[in-house]
Amino acid sequence: MKLREWNAHLHGLVVFRALLNDPVVAKLLDLTDRMEAGCSSYGPVCDAVAAFEAALFEYTTNWGSYLSNAVLEAETICVRQAAAGQLDALLQSALDSELQFLQQLCGLTLDELFQTAYSEQAQRPELAFLPRWQTCELDLAAAYAQRMSEVGKKGYGMFAKHHVFTVENGQLVPVKYPDPQRLSELPGYEKEREKVIANTKALLAGMPANNVLLYGDAGTGKSSAVKAIANEFAPEGLRLVEVKKNQLYQIPDLMDKLAANPLKFILFIDDLSFTANDDNFAALKAILEGSVGGRAQNIAVYATSNRRHLIKETLSDRTGDDIHEADTRQKLMSLSARFGLTVTFQRPEKARFETILEELAKQHNIQMPTEQLLLKAEAFALRAGGRSPRVAKQFIEQCEAGVQK
């Protein structure tokens, strides 16, 4: 393929148009543009090669590996249509053509690029010092077909690269370094978590799944359970979207955006509570009741709360003049009943606390006699305000750091 063809095919990408915004591919396009322009000086070309390689080497030295991963993870109209079960014939033809070109591009070397731009007589030793990136051979069309068949688990676009997201200005933003909590690292409360896990498995299987409320005492592992479940089932196609309380009104729009996505989503609201006149109360109630649009089958709302009834009562709430005050309070407190599944996390009694401690001590390889460990932990818990898994973990971390001896 001649330089002009490489350059034209890059500029002419349709299905994979978004690749031109990729930081590495964009540098390659700039390089071929400069070479195609026929720069009389080698300076601009050397600069473009160096810029391309610097961008590539931030990730890998293998250009073929980088480009193939970018292709497989790209969000395109083809992958969206295929996920919905129908791919237009014209788009299929365009997809096949571009995959054929991109496979060739995966094998492009610097020497080959120079040979297409300059005759052997015209090449100069000034270019010899430039490093040579690696390439790889692969059947990109077959790899892409395989990826399309697994899109319900691996996703596309940012959902292929990340599994935890937050919401900023109505848009999903990937969390690059999510909490790495694993279920195996959470001793105790197995029965409570199993209910949430079973509901999550139903969601992943495309079966009816409940919205879930995890409520109970602070520090009992409610939030950790949700995050660990998200980590555990990410390879199965689960994604977690953390929604703040003041963003609840955005949930209907988020559901609309995610409804056609082949992945499954948990909209996670942590530490949920309201005052009686909170506008967010009405928003969440409408969402849970399904009165704001229909609930998508690939989405469930999981919330944690330290209060069973979610509503923070004040003295004025209890002594107001409203003749319907009792009915109002009843309506407010009934919000918790709108969750299909509620799971209680209670502060552990002494025996349960000690079991959690011993398991955490094993995980962290704490070398301390059991009797001494339990006595010190009990004293630590008293100073910390009571027993809880969080307190147990804090104590073990202090032992690991040498603070507790």
Protein language model features and the residues they cover:
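Conserved AAA+ ATPase "SRH/arginine-finger" region at the nucleotide-binding site
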Residues: D321-M333, G340-E354
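Pre-Walker A (pre-P-loop) alpha-helix and adjacent loop at the N terminus of AAA/AAA+ ATPase modules
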Residues: P178-N211
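Walker B catalytic acidic pair
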Residues: D270-L272
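C-terminal alpha-helical "lid" subdomain
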Residues: Q346-K405
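AAA+ P-loop ATPase mechanoenzymes
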Residues: M1-P187
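Walker A/P-loop
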Residues: N211-V241, L254-A259
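Short glycine-rich substrate-engagement loop in P-loop NTPases that contacts/grips substrate
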Residues: R193-I197, A234-F265, A276-A282
